[in-house]
Design a protein with these regions (language model features):
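Flexible, compositionally biased loop and terminal segments
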Residues: 1-230
Length: 230
């Protein structure tokens, strides 16, 4: 049977710290391995025909972590952007970031905007990185913008236009590390997304694990609130 490949996959990339701890390493090593895992996953998703990949990289709640860890994550993201620029252009990957801009170092913000502009016409796959992102924050920001615009009688379609991007809703949400929660991620957008939870830690999430997730997705009966015809 031919596989039905999700158009949009979202991932809560969890478990970097636990991966490092199991090996007696600092959490920063786990984050570095997590970046390698993202590179590998993006390449495979591109190969199999996924059109949008949204990954949860840094939440609005992550500012409560130690200053050293937050600084490491900022530097790692900056390094990722610089190192992946050539690859994104070569493989026609569109780069996008969803989240608030406040508190992000200016140098990092500039590199984000630069890469977004450089890749805006790439059409193979869109990599959407949720950075300084929280879904409640996104919803509040949307509501405030609607109020500023003086809009009334808002529909779901109208509201969606005020979110951080206009990408289609995720078909499949994957969470690694076995945690059974959404963690303030894409609350509006995942209303009818299929959920897949794996105990595999993010640095170990490879092509075989992706295949398992898609196989599980293919076994689902997506009714979107309706009733299947008999």
């Amino acid at each position: 049977m031919e596989k039905n490949i999700p158009q949009h996959i979202a991932i809560i990339m969890d478990g970097n710290g636990r991966w490092a701890k199991k090996r007696g390493l600092a959490r920063s090593f786990g984050h570095m391995e997590g970046a390698k895992s993202l590179r590998r996953a993006l390449e495979y998703f591109t190969e199999i025909g996924v059109k949008y990949l949204t990954v949860y990289a840094f939440s609005t709640e992550n500012w409560s972590r130690s200053q050293d860890e937050v600084s490491t994550l900022m530097k790692l993201f900056l390094k990722y952007i610089k190192s992946e620029r050539k690859n994104m252009m070569k493989n026609k990957i569109r780069f996008f970031v969803s989240g608030r801009k406040n508190n992000i170092p200016e140098k990092l913000l500039n590199e984000i905007e630069k890469l977004k502009e450089e890749t805006k016409n790439n059409d193979k796959i869109t990599l959407n990185i949720a950075f300084n992102y929280g879904s409640r924050a996104e919803i509040i920001d949307a509501v405030n913008d609607i109020i500023k615009d003086g809009k009334e009688n808002i529909t779901e379609e109208d509201f969606s236009k005020y979110l951080y991007n206009d990408f289609p809703d995720p078909d499949l949400l994957i969470r690694t590390s076995g945690e059974m929660r959404i963690s303030n991620f894409l609350l509006w957008q995942i209303a009818y997304s299929e959920l897949y939870i794996t105990d595999t830690l993010w640095p170990d999430f490879d092509e075989k694990e992706i295949d398992k997730a898609i196989e599980s997705y293919n076994q689902r009966d997506r009714r979107f609130g309706g009733v299947k015809n008999v």
